């Protein structure tokens, strides 16, 4: 399915978007109904968990999902969204289609029914979400070794950096100080995958933690 835009511009806010995602995930047919369990927005993408139940109370049988104890199944859905000239639009995909966007929170993944096929697109999508969630959020002063050198716009590279910040107006923005040059660089979360904590700012104030980290290096 392609993009669908609401040219009446009735979607204007986060609350409007969430209400529309809820509506899109809530419907009833002749034999089944679907209802939203949880929705989370990450950047411009909405992730949803939707539960399917049979109207007659019997267990839902599905080729992709293991039926839950209450007879329902809960699947994941992804809604790409954007605004075009003031009009909000979306493109939706069910997890079994293997969406590229894979940053669903672990709290949402925990609501989904088990999958029958461990080699399915849905299983691979869930694993990508888990891998993303596993990337650490470093704290101010943490010294880090990236899994691979990052090439900067001037052609130089960096691999050992320290988490710090810079200010833009009243806001603090995360950046990293390069070990070799002292320069500052902004890094995407993806570039921190498989990185290693060399020393922690907390370790300086905690002899026990400092000893633990020293033993790892």
Could you say what each language-model-derived stretch is?
Residues 23-82, 150-167:
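Amphipathic, interaction-prone secondary-structure segments
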Residues 153-190:
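Basic/aromatic-rich interaction segments and small domains that mediate binding to polyanionic partners
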Residues 31-45, 122-125, 131, 141-145:
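Short glycine-rich, low-complexity/disordered patches
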Residues 46-48, 142, 172-176:
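Short beta-strand micro-motifs in enzyme catalytic cores
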Residues 1-31:
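Charged, amphipathic alpha-helical stretches
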Residues 86-133, 175-217:
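Intrinsically disordered, low-complexity, charged/polar segments
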Residues 136-150:
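Short coil-to-beta transition motif at edge beta-strands of beta-rich domains
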Residues 14-18, 32-36, 59, 73, ...:
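Short amphipathic alpha-helical segments that mediate assembly, nucleic-acid/protein binding
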